[in-house]
A protein has these predicted regions:
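PAPS/PAP-binding and catalytic site of the sulfotransferase fold
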Residues: 15-29, 101-105, 187-212
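PAPS-dependent sulfotransferase catalytic domain
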Residues: 66-77, 122-207
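PAPS-dependent sulfotransferase catalytic core
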Residues: 1-73, 81, 129, 141-144, ...
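Conserved phosphate-donor/acceptor-positioning beta-strand/loop module used by diverse small-molecule
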Residues: 90, 101-126
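Hydrophobic/aromatic beta-strand patches that form the interior of the parallel beta-sheet core
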Residues: 6, 30, 109-112, 186-188
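Glycine-rich phosphate-binding loop used to anchor ATP phosphates in small-molecule kinases
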Residues: 70, 74-97
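Short catalytic/ligand-binding loop motif for oxyanion handling, primarily in non-cytosolic enzymes
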Residues: 17-20, 38-41, 95-98, 118-123, ...
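PAPS-dependent sulfotransferases, especially Golgi type II membrane carbohydrate sulfotransferases
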Residues: 1-6, 157-161, 175-179, 206-279
Length: 279
């Protein structure tokens, strides 16, 4: 029986899938792949605002019933997948549904995984060359890889429907909510996890108020449910290795000093908030 639902969100290309797979080794914790639950909420929210029979209900009755319907539905969804007591639902979309998630359970916690934007951009760039069959564009339907590099670096961060641009756009709202509820949020930098994975996980367990679990970094389990990346038709890759490897920053070898500076200047608030040492 699911006793507690938590959320994993943040930015793409941050090793969130890997961290979820590591946590999934714990017999008390079930972690999802990319979770579709936010889309159920979106559909219910939309229909309950359109259909007369919903709107005819007393506002408070509708609110209570609506929240309880979603709360019980999410519980039932995950209990069909696992008998573990703690569930981590991974989706960047959760950042757009905080009034909902706090209404479901104010005790839920939010693991927010971030990374230097320059390395996220480098990761996307390498995926576009690794999978040339993927048709990736910035909304204008022109081949994205043919656009000038300065344009690409800007569009990754500013296109609000893109894999990085959308969660980056909602991040200030996320931080506002996190400041109001500091014990509910844990900001995990990819760089910290990369340098000190065991310490990072110990800190996560402490924050979750769970006993520490000694993970085997040489035998990282696969996700319980395989995720078919081709479906997304985008620069997405969720396969992880079975051994934890330390990564070196990519951007110093890939970007010029001018390009690196442009990413920082275009996203100054991000670097001031999370990576002031890069300024």
């Amino acid at each position: 029986i699911m006793q507690q639902l938590h959320y994993c969100l943040g930015l793409p290309r941050t090793a969130s899938t890997l961290i979820m797979n590591i946590l999934n080794e714990n017999p008390r914790i079930f972690t999802t792949g990319t979770c579709p639950m936010p889309y159920f909420i979106d559909a219910c929210k939309q229909r309950s605002n359109e259909v007369s029979e919903f709107i005819a209900l007393d506002k408070d009755v509708l609110h209570k019933s609506y929240i309880n319907f979603l709360r019980q539905g999410i519980k039932g969804w995950f209990e069909a997948m696992t008998d573990k007591p703690i569930v981590f639902s991974k989706s960047r979309m959760w950042a757009e549904y905080f009034p909902h998630t706090f209404a479901f359970d104010p005790n839920s916690k939010y693991l927010v995984i971030l990374r230097d934007l320059r390395d996220i951009i480098c990761s996307f760039e390498s995926l576009s060359w690794k999978y040339p069959q993927v048709n990736y564009s910035a909304g204008d339907n022109k081949p994205f890889h043919q656009a000038p590099v300065d344009y690409r670096m800007e569009m990754y961060c500013t296109d609000t429907m893109s894999l990085l641009g959308r969660p980056l756009h909602t991040l200030p709202h996320l931080i506002e909510v996190a400041k109001q509820n500091p014990s509910n949020f844990f900001l995990c930098k990819h760089e910290h996890f990369n340098e000190e994975p065991r310490v990072t996980l110990q800190n996560i367990y402490q924050w979750l108020e769970e006993p520490n679990f000694e993970h085997d970094f040489d035998n990282i389990p696969k996700s319980d449910y395989y995720e078919h990346d081709t479906v997304y038709r985008s620069l997405v890759y969720h396969k992880t290795g079975t051994k934890l490897k330390k990564l070196e920053p990519r951007w110093p070898k890939v970007m010029t000093e001018e390009q690196s500076r442009a990413v920082i200047d275009n996203n100054r608030w991000y670097y001031e908030t999370f990576y002031p040492e890069a300024l």
